[in-house]
Every structure is written in C-alpha cells, then in structure tokens.
C-alpha cells in the first residue's frame, strides 16, 4: 500500500513492459526517450539565454512607450 517501494513491484512493472513492447523494442524506446530529454534540455537552455538578452530591448521599448504616452497626455491637456 506504500507505493512502488518494493523490488517486486518494479520486477512486475518491468515484466509488463517487456511483454507489451518486446525485448527488441525497449532499446529503441529508451533511445527515443533520451534524445527527447536532450532536445528538451537544449530548448530550455536556449530559451534561458534568449531571456537574458531580451530584457534590454523590452526596457528600451517601455521607456519609449512611456515617453510617447506622456507627450500625448501633455498635448491633450494643452488642448
């Protein structure tokens, strides 16, 4: 009842996997899973690098937008 803590639970799970997929298919599945994880980690790393570079451009855009909005407000107040 405590979950998958017993070695026998894992043996049964392994046997079911072998019966479902066959012994020849398991290495292919493991290889596909490994390459999927590798691609996922690479994508996360690339996104983190882009995020480090991105705030510089966003800050500049925010400053320009605030300056534009404040000039519009002043022109409306003068009218």
Curated annotation (Swiss-Prot):
The chain crosses the membrane at residues 1-21. GO terms for molecular function: protein transmembrane transporter activity. Its main location: membrane. Residues 48-79 are annotated as: Disordered. Gene3D superfamilies: 1.20.5.3310. GO terms for cellular component: TAT protein transport complex. Signal peptide: none annotated. Keywords: Cell inner membrane, Cell membrane, Membrane, Protein transport, Translocation, Transmembrane, Transmembrane helix, Transport. GO terms for biological process: protein transport by the Tat complex. It is a single-pass membrane protein. InterPro entries: TatA/B/E, TatA/E. Coiled coil: none annotated. It is found in: Cell inner membrane. Residues 66-79 have a biased composition (Basic and acidic residues). Part of the twin-arginine translocation (Tat) system that transports large folded proteins containing a characteristic twin-arginine motif in their signal peptide across membranes. TatA could form the protein-conducting channel of the Tat system. Belongs to the TatA/E family. This is Sec-independent protein translocase protein TatA. It comes from Helicobacter pylori (strain P12).
């Amino acid at each position: 009842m405590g979950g998958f803590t017993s070695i026998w639970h894992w043996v049964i799970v392994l046997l079911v996997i072998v019966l479902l997929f066959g012994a020849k298919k398991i290495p292919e599945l493991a290889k596909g899973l490994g390459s999927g994880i590798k691609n996922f980690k690479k994508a996360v790393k690339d996104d983190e690098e882009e995020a480090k570079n991105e705030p510089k451009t966003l800050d500049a855009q925010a400053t320009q937008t605030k300056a534009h909005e404040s000039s519009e407000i002043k022109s409306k107040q003068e009218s």
